[in-house]
Swiss-Prot record:
This is NEDD8-conjugating enzyme UBE2F. The keyword ATP-binding applies. Pathway: Protein modification; protein neddylation. The acetylation of Met-1 increases affinity for DCUN1D3 by about 2 orders of magnitude and is crucial for NEDD8 transfer to cullins. It comes from Rattus norvegicus.
Amino acid sequence: MLTLASKLKRDDGLKGSRASASTSDSTRRVSVRDKLLVKEVAELEANLPCTCKVHFPDPNKLHCFQLTVSPDEGYYQGGKFQFETEVPDAYNMVPPKVKCLTKIWHPNITETGEICLSLLREHSIDGTGWAPTRTLKDVVWGLNSLFTDLLNFDDPLNIEAAEHHLRDKEDFRDKVDEYIKRYAR
């Protein structure tokens, strides 16, 4: 799986023998992001919640992956929700960019896929935003928790969904179920 890891080992082994090589050092240099991702992806795969699956469309590009969350409790039980994650070059100084690809009726996720999760914010007033000490594991566990304990109707991104829940919880549940049947199977 971690083919980038073997590339890093190979590149480290070539450092000494490259002094006379004609290729420039910058074309073979591995970014800090990619070095971090090798370690973080291994940690993530070892500590993945049972309701989550990670897929790397290209195993040589650990900075682009998809996450599937299949909640086993709560309003969203029975659905499969796809997220696309892109880790920018400036990682770990900035958070990954995450978008929900599955249309969903959720107070913290818009129907167009924007996500309200404090640890994905570069700047956060409450101190719970992104910090260089956070990892991909934190991001995945945070996204998973949006379907259970981090489901937040008091500080919504999708105000219409939050107000719907306040007005009529049963109708809210029915609409969530309808979205799951139409978009999240």
